[in-house]
Design a protein with these regions (language model features):
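Alpha-helical support elements that line or immediately flank enzyme active sites
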Residues: 100-113, 164-180, 184-187
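N-terminal alpha-helical segment
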Residues: 37, 163-164
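Generic long, charged, amphipathic alpha-helical segments
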Residues: 135-160
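Catalytic cores of secreted or luminal carbohydrate-active enzymes
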Residues: 184, 218-221
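Generic recognition of flexible, low-complexity loop/linker segments
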Residues: 91-94, 153-157, 167-169
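Catalytic cores of carbohydrate-active enzymes
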Residues: 4-19, 26-32, 36-124, 129-137, ...
Length: 221
């Protein structure tokens, strides 16, 4: 299933991202992994063209992935992609998407301008926002968690700097420059000014209730 044996052009996710520690999609059709494969096939098609090889199979797969994502994973009534679609049973959609389900399709070019804009509005509306407070008084911005999933489990609900920064990039890529700048500035202030090691950039924010400032100089960053 990781390599699409059923030929539906949507992919399971296994060790695709840092958060994969506790993500289990059980063979389902996953948004972020499908978006990565879309970008990979587009790049392979471009390389094939440059070296004079046939790009047909790569271009076809990229086009098919995008079509399947739009038909099965994009929820137009909600304005964002589903986290994934179950493989078995009722083939239900997991409708409470994580940050990586929003910023990855945007970064991979697997979204229209309208989809990108609407998906970032989902983050505004449904992803928890945590005020960044200085001197216990002044709120200077906000950071965000990766999901609203409960109960807490490592890698499925964190306040992680690389995730916040990726989401800030998605705001910029969606044309929402003010929101992107505000979130990025807030994240850098949270870690590089207010953190325990000023000027450093770790993985987890001290606003992460369970882990606090874990994994200083973590390679995933």
């Amino acid at each position: 299933r990781n390599f699409d044996p059923d030929g539906d052009h949507l992919y399971d996710a296994y060790c695709c991202i840092w958060a994969s520690d506790a993500l289990y999609y059980n063979g389902g059709a996953v948004t972020h992994s499908s978006a990565y494969n879309y970008r990979g096939n587009r790049l392979a098609a471009r390389i094939a063209q440059l070296i004079g090889e046939d790009d047909t199979k790569y271009r076809f797969e990229a086009e098919s992935i995008l079509k399947a994502m739009n038909e099965r994973l994009w929820m137009d009534d909600r304005g964002h992609w589903a986290e994934y679609q179950d493989l078995m049973g009722l083939k239900r959609l997991h409708k409470s998407a994580a940050l990586w389900t929003i910023y990855t399709p945007i970064d991979c070019g697997a979204s229209s301008p309208e989809q990108a804009y609407r998906a970032t509005k989902y983050v505004d509306r449904d992803i928890p926002h945590i005020p960044i407070v200085v001197n216990k008084v002044d709120t200077i911005g906000y950071t965000i968690s990766t999901t609203d999933w409960m109960p807490y489990a490592w890698s499925t609900n964190n306040v992680a700097h690389e995730e916040v920064a990726n989401m800030a990039l998605a705001y910029f890529q969606s044309g929402r420059n003010n929101e992107g700048f505000h979130l990025l500035k807030s994240d850098l202030t949270d870690e590089m000014l207010l953190g325990k090691s000023p000027g450093n950039f770790g993985q987890i924010s001290h606003y992460d209730r369970e882990r606090n400032e874990a994994y200083r100089d973590f390679g995933d960053n």
